[in-house]
Amino acid sequence: MVKNSFISLIPQEEKEENRGSVEFQVFSFTNKIRRLTSHLELHRKDYLSQRGLRKILGKRQRLLAYLSKKNRVRYNKLIGQLDIREPKTR
């Protein structure tokens, strides 16, 4: 597994100021999801990591739903930057 393969999309000065912003939280969850996904490709039966991945996916999904309700422009920009799919609506 390569640790430093993820390039930061948020500039360093913005990271220091906005660690609580929805965009930063979604960005950090996305990095964790990518790391866990690459880990699970090697270790398919690691059920605790699978559970952690599902929990992080749920948190990211809730944050993205919140952001899409509050500010659709920022939501679309973030989805494009992180290259993640828009969730299906029920």
Curated annotation (Swiss-Prot):
Q: Which is one Gene Ontology cellular component term of this protein?
A: ribonucleoprotein complex
Q: Which UniProt keywords apply?
A: Chloroplast, Plastid, Ribonucleoprotein, Ribosomal protein
Ribonucleoprotein is among the record's keywords:
yes
Q: Which residues form the signal peptide?
A: none
Query: What InterPro entries is this protein classified in?
Result: Ribosomal_uS15 (IPR000589), Ribosomal_uS15_bac-type (IPR005290), uS15_NS1_RNA-bd_sf (IPR009068)
The cross-references to Gene3D superfamilies, in alphabetical order and at most eight, read: S15/NS1, RNA-binding
- What's a BP term from Gene Ontology annotated to this protein? translation
Compartment(s) of residence: Plastid, Chloroplast
Single GO molecular function: structural constituent of ribosome
- Give any Pfam family that matches: Ribosomal_S15
Is Chloroplast given among the entry's keywords?
Answer: yes
Q: Which SMART domains match?
A: Ribosomal_S15
Q: Which domain of life is it from?
A: Eukaryota
- Family affiliation: Belongs to the universal ribosomal protein uS15 family.
Assembly notes:
Part of the 30S ribosomal subunit.
The molecule here is called: Small ribosomal subunit protein uS15c
Q: What's the source species for this entry?
A: Acorus calamus
Q: Which gene encodes it?
A: rps15
